[in-house]
Amino acid sequence: GIVMREVQRKTEAPHFAPDHPKAVSDLMMWLERAERIRTQQRTDKNKLYALHAPEVECLAKGKARKPYEFGVKSAVVVSHKHGLVLGARTFPGNPYDGHILSAVLEQATNITQDLSVTIRQVVADLGFRGVDADNPGKEIIHRGRYKSLSPQQKGWLRRRQAVEPAIGHLKSDHRMDRCWLQGALGDALHAVSCAAGYNLRWLLRAIARLGLG
């Protein structure tokens, strides 16, 4: 607080940067963000977590080792058989998981429309339950329906665990864990770029495995 008050006193001087209004406005913006961080409380809503990126949100993961992550919510669609990433989207505002499923499936459908592939079954975690009416024509399978699933569907549900290492590789090998682009548009471009890099590396491994190189 002492440094902020000292800077504010100097900015109120009549001779302070009269020929640089842009620099003054930028300085006022940083001072406003610093004051917001200084005065916010633990239980406040819409807290500011990063000076350089006010769009950063706190995401509760529910894991003992890492209960919270800071950034923007992302959703990934992975193919069942080969593990290719069919869609990657960001959702500012930290919406409920079930409300983003239709948007993610729309992106995956647009990407695969030239392959004459129709997405009929969706295997997801419990966060996507209760949204069947919002996704007509799609069979949503999750472990909340385990007792009513067929043996084949139970196998699909076990196969769904393969998406977790795919997300881990996106974060560790393709730099999805930290976005260096600015704003919501930068977050969206970063997610798509990481997914494209993942698929390119998958394709290079397939070429080497089949001896086509």
Regions found by a protein language model. Name each.
Residues 194-201:
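Charge-patterned, long linear interaction tracts outside catalytic cores
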Residues 172-173, 177-179, 202-213:
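A short, flexible helix-boundary coil/loop motif
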Residues 113-189:
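Helix-centered, glycine/charged polyanion-binding patches within enzymatic domains
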